[in-house]
Amino acid sequence: MKLTCVLIVAVLILTACQLIAADDSRDLKRFSRRKMRDGMLNTKNMKRQCLPPLSLCTMDDDECCDDCXLFLCLVTS
């Protein structure tokens, strides 16, 4: 009886972890926080200096890098 209860609790915890992880990763490329922030900040009155393509970057950079892969800035536009 105790083993059954432990197994049920373990399955419930693992299911909850799966659901939490699935919510965070849904449409991550299409609606990333960085692109949403850049869309809100992209106005006619505001000009920002962008990193040139293939320059070194980190995920914390604010220099309008579209995607940072292997520490290189990939700019699509």
UniProtKB/Swiss-Prot annotation:
One of its GO terms (molecular function) is ion channel inhibitor activity. GO terms for cellular component: extracellular region. Keywords: Cleavage on pair of basic residues, Disulfide bond, Knottin, Neurotoxin, Pyrrolidone carboxylic acid, Secreted, Signal, Toxin. Expressed by the venom duct. Residues 1-22 form the signal peptide. It is found in: Secreted. Residues 23-46 form a propeptide. Pfam families: Conotoxin. The modification Pyrrolidone carboxylic acid is found at residue 49. It comes from the Eukaryota. Disulfide bonds join 50-65, 57-68, 64-73. Belongs to the conotoxin O1 superfamily. The presence of a 'disulfide through disulfide knot' structurally defines this protein as a knottin. This is Conotoxin ArMKLT2-0251.
